[in-house]
């Protein structure tokens, strides 16, 4: 990867990793490395989830009952833990999306305020 690509990378906002993991698993079961790669690919290489954040996040979501994990064999013929979204995880993703939309709207109002007529 070129230095230019690294310069384009964006830091994940606090609290967005769970939403991104849940959304990625909405497309189907995936192992941890695949989840990180999917987030990176879907963001056009702008988001990179570090292993030190991804796996604790997966374990946290599994503990909350939003993910279910099972051992399987990866495309590289390696043993891997596959995660899938549960019904509770789907409901949580819906809540996270609603909150995200509200946050984006609120930030947009601050960044692009309506004209007030004041100079």
What do the predicted segments below correspond to?
Residues 9-53:
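N-terminal helix-turn-helix DNA-binding core of bacterial DNA-binding proteins
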Residues 10, 51, 79-82, 97, ...:
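Short, structured helix-loop boundary elements
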Residues 23, 37, 59, 94, ...:
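A cross-family signal for key residues in well-ordered alpha-helices
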Residues 62-78, 84:
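Beta-hairpin "wing" of winged helix-turn-helix
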Residues 88-119:
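Amphipathic alpha-helical dimerization/coiled-coil segments
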């Amino acid at each position: 990867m070129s230095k230019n690509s690294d310069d384009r990378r964006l830091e994940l906002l606090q609290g967005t990793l769970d939403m991104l993991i849940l959304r990625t698993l909405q497309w189907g079961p995936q192992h941890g490395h695949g989840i990180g790669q999917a987030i990176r690919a879907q963001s056009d290489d702008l988001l990179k989830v570090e292993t030190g954040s991804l796996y604790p996040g997966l374990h946290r979501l599994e503990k909350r009952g939003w993910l279910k994990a099972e051992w399987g064999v990866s495309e590289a013929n390696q043993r891997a833990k596959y995660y899938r979204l549960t019904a509770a995880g789907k409901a949580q993703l819906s809540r996270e999306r609603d909150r995200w939309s509200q946050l984006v709207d609120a930030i947009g109002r601050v960044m692009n305020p309506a004209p007030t007529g004041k100079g």
